[in-house]
């Protein structure tokens, strides 16, 4: 049976973004160890958000692109986030 997880290599801003979200009362489920999946599932104010965290000019891997396409074909937004203000804006905090 194939493993559905891999050695976690998180972007440098991953932990800080998760901490920021939790400080604003969001529930964050960290999925970074899953293959071909988004980094975090965020639940905030009655909404669910799928987010892929990238630092700098980081690009989506082939597996992440596959996940993004799968999520979006069901009409769900797949957010690629890099900065604190961007994350807070998506949640409507700023």
Predicted features along the sequence, with ranges:
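Catalytic phosphate/metal-binding cores of nucleic-acid and nucleotide-processing enzymes, i.e., regions
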Residues: 1-94
């Amino acid at each position: 049976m194939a493993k559905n997880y891999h050695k976690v290599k998180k972007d440098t801003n991953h932990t800080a973004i998760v901490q920021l979200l939790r400080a604003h009362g969001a529930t964050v489920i960290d999925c970074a160890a899953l293959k071909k999946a988004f980094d975090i599932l965020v639940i905030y104010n009655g909404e669910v958000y799928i987010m892929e965290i990238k630092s700098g000019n980081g690009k989506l891997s082939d597996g992440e692109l596959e996940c993004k396409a799968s999520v979006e074909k069901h009409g769900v937004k797949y957010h690629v986030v890099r900065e604190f203000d961007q994350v807070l804006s998506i949640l409507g905090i700023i």
